[in-house]
Curated annotation (Swiss-Prot):
It holds the Pfam family Disintegrin. Ca(2+) 1 binds at E204, D286, C390, N393. It catalyses: Specifically activates several components of the blood clotting system, including coagulation factor X, coagulation factor IX and protein C by cleavage of Arg-|-Xaa bonds. Has no action on insulin B chain. Residues 403-489 form the Disintegrin domain. It comes from Macrovipera lebetinus. Residues 201-395 form the Peptidase M12B domain. This is Coagulation factor X-activating enzyme heavy chain. Calcium is required for the activity of the heterotrimer. A motif (D/ECD-tripeptide) lies at residues 467-469. It comes from the Eukaryota.
Amino acid sequence: MMQVLLVTISLAVFPYQGSSIILESGNVNDYEVVYPQKITALPEEAVQQPEQKYEDTMQYEFEVNGEPVVLHLEKNKDLFSEDYSETRYSPDGRETTTKPPVQDHCYYHGRIQNDAYSSASISACNGLKGHFKLQGETYLIEPLKIPDSEAHAVYKYENIEKEDEAPKMCGVTQTNWESDEPIKKASQLVATSAKRKFHKTFIELVIVVDHRVVKKYDSAATNTKIYEIVNTVNEIFIPLNIRLTLIGVEFWCNRDLINVTSSADDTLDSFGEWRGSDLLNRKRHDNAQLFTDMKFDLSTLGITFLDGMCQAYRSVGIVQEHGNKNFKTAVIMAHELGHNLGMYHDRKNCICNDSSCIMSAVLSSQPSKLFSNCSNHDYRRYLTTYKPKCILNPPLRKDIASPPICGNEIWEEGEECDCGSPKDCQNPCCDAATCKLTPGAECGNGLCCEKCKIKTAGTVCRRARDECDVPEHCTGQSAECPADGFHANGQPCQNNNGYCYNGDCPIMTKQCISLFGSRATVAEDSCFQENQKGSYYGYCRKENGRKIPCAPQDIKCGRLYCLDNSPGNKNPCKMHYRCRDQHKGMVEPGTKCEDGKVCNNKRQCVDVNTAY
């Protein structure tokens, strides 16, 4: 039996419904005024935790176009990690890192009742603010600033007055990959989604806020903006079974820590260098996005490295912020992350169930939240080809910050199991209604659970992927497989041709093969002398757009030179160089550069015993 608590919000007369009004998103030509009524449905035995300000699930009822709609909301428990932190800098350059309380946050995902294709991303911090999709149309909702009133404005995205400006586009250009495999039509995507679910992946994200944005907004407004944007990006990636978790935010309060210029390419290159040599050493994460107010050349609104996810210098992106148009900024960020995950710009034959798709090279006047059939195809290819380790391992239950939500198929602290909703659950060990184990069951989820029993101690639950990885074994006490580990950095591998680095064995031969094919090998030592020149092609690193030559002892940590043995193309000193992706083709961190030495994140050849 359910108890239904109906909170009726007093109505106020608002005389300007339907006319033009200036709202947070800009000048809106047509809108409705609504008064959401909150409907809280709790099980009879449920008790709301007194210290919890924001409920885990909520429902609101209001009218759109004269028809009642019920908005179901569920707190986005993936939004923050357990160790979420914020870093700021004082005028003298000292960094201060804090860990604000984020468990009881007010950011939700949702859906509209009786609309199977609906979705929503909502902030409930002060009224309802965000967007929802209803009957194929994208609507925005926000509170009206009227004293003692619960009035909200609801309007279609298309009714925001457009700025008179040149078309905005993505700065990624090397997106001409085509496959011989047939691309599924949009109508086929729904039919096959249940059969071909994407493997669940987890991206731990850091947002870096440049000095222009820090000066533009106060601290609270900047935080709210970032949370709303990441909440929406998280929602956009749900159909691909990707979960984004915010690990931290870094604010460049006093000055930019790189040279942010109107050249998007140079800024991206500098940001990648900084992330690989600085941020990655301080903060564990998978990807970093620079949030900037710089107006880039060529109407560029974002740029990133294709296939760059999990790579020290390439798992980054640049996103231009668009004032209070958080939905637009979120779509740009999702687009750039899509490139990091192997997605190319949509080609002519690419379609989705919308007028445009996320990976369009030019941002539509009505930005879409949908990936095309081509993007789905590209992402599958990326997972198969690159097998990006950093995003394939789920966070441990203790690392999830938000309270558990029964029925979301994520086994969280406080739950004995979670197999989804009662309608979808196929697990005989778990009671879907309560997330409790069925009588006689020892476990219901986890890699160390089999036929409702915990596997015996010593049973392998995660096999070693290669010689630098280690297998994980069940403890006999828990159904959860221990955290993924690997051999210590610096352990010899590949017959002493390399040293282990973060679970991989990076050697130059494999990197040459990746760039130029199976016939490629490492070039003669004389080729690497080019890296001492600090030339257009040969250098060790870049600082504020200037190419720094390698010191003599570091030449094998700069640009990689290979011997291409393919027929008709025997170049003794071949290297990979693209103006728009200068990190690709550099020797990877952790690579052996001499006996007993490896390349560190600063592209220096250092003793393996002191490198880590």
